[in-house]
Amino acid sequence: TGVSEITVQAYKSGKLSIRAIARGLKGGFVSGVLELDVPNPPLDRIVFVDPDKKVYTGTNVSYEAQVFDKANLLREDVEVNFSTNNNKTAEFDRFGNLTVKKPGKFVITVSAEDIDEELKVQSKKNPVKSLTLSSPKNEIRTGDVIKLDASPLDSRGRAVKDVPISYSYSGQAVYSDVFINNKSSESVGLPASGTITNEGKFVAETPGVYTITAQSSGYSAIAKVKVVPRNVKRRIEVVGHGTVTDHHTSDLWVWAGVGKHKGKDFAVTGTHSADGEAYFWDITNPSKMTIIDTIKVDARTVNDVKISEDGRVGIISREGASNRKNGLVILDVTDPYNVTITKMYDDDLTGGVHNVFIYQDHVYALSAGTRYDIINISDPANPFRVSSYELDTPGHSIHDVWVENGIAYSSNWADGVHIVDVGGIPQREQSRDKSSFNPFLAMAGKGSPGNPVKLASKSDPNGHNHATFPFVSQSSDRFYMINGDEWAKSIPGSAERIYQGGFHFIDFTDVNNPQETAIYQVPEVGSHNHWVEGDILYAGYYYGGIRVLDISGELLGDLYAQGREIAFFEGRDPNGKIANETNVWGVIPYKGLIYFADHYNGLWAVKLVDEEPLGTN
């Protein structure tokens, strides 16, 4: 028996569970749970969000306000109400939209429970006498984004810049590759589907003829746009498969051989919930890939495997070691047929290493899901830690880190993505053309592996940020962070859980104002790891196989619904660890092929075929 006293500090209101576990000398344990109810703090203030203080008659203006409590927490659970002191001049509906009726001065009051805030507003006579609308293109594909140009004009034909404009669209979907007189016998009478923003950006999900309408100040104008199928579908063909029957497969890496193995290609895969094995493969002839060596360490799971850019050093992670000293293992992979252990490194990494990354003689290793350590491996036999990066938010945790051009991108669940300078080359030393411009490199130059410097971050409102990949669009002037979800929900009446979520495209072109603009989400299952090459996303989708997605051009709306999915494939094997099922973990494009690790059955190599378009989704 014993007593342990703890102090708990609450950072959010709601139900809180505290679990205590006591382990016995023979490996058993007992546990108990205490449920606490943390009440909401009193409300403190209401803040208008970028409000319009000058408005025009005949317009509708949206207002937004945020409520904060005494703990300075944003309270999205509190309902706010808007009103004016003169409904004859301007009046709100219940959604926070203000209708301006006549010129004058009035006061807007926003209230929540026992607090309120006021805003003085002036309405002016509306000078708009007409409205024009034009489209930059008459015909686009599904998924293509266009910006409509709406111009409110005064009596002299001069543009009025600060008048609000609302946009809408209508149309009928056409499910055919061929339009005859802008109609098709395959049309089934469904309405056309797409997205239009408050700025007039439009993207279609279904083919058809769309009528886009702009409205302002009692005037309206229309533009018509024909939308045709995107036609990017291709087929996936199996090139080779290496079956793993004994254990669940985790992640993979592929690389080119060096030294006497120059001209050959190799891969490594880990194992999960097994006995600490990593398999090395010769994939020079991918149709006859074979395991050529095995490394076994004290671990239940070798979750992550990485190879250095020069093809000489390998890193495998360890979780579930018998002595609880996990850490990572440094390997000499110069001869993949005879891989040797150079060093076991577990200094302050005993909580388990889930993911690692190698960049320029340093390993970025996750430590117990709380931080990443930066470890110098310039001499692989004598590694040493040079720094760590850890968030300071309550209850923080980390799942992954990726390093590119000296910028580290970490995925931190609810805290989202953190972008850190660990030795970035300032952009002025590189090409600044749109195919290579990363705005974070324009901010780089102060950080190093021994002195990581945070550049930016964006939280994840869903709390599911599991993996992040930086994407410099090769066909637009955009820089995106592609943030992958990982979460599972229970199936009613069953103990089974099914993965959910997808990929969120965060436009970081303006690093001070990142915006989520698009999402790719498959209806039947959730995402895992992903990779980008050119303007194509390759994704592992657990039970949904691998997915290949066209991410060219500006990205807006529901990418799955827009027919951007190029192909998908489910690798099933009757001799796998789990027979005739698929569960894709990671995917890497390499030398024109797509390699992926299936949790249930091993390593695959596939390729895209049929260059000619086959139609839409």
Model-derived regions: residue spans:
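Extracytoplasmic soluble-region selector
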Residues: T1-K233
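Feature marking well-ordered beta-strand scaffolds used for ligand recognition
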Residues: S130, D177-N182, S193, E199, ...
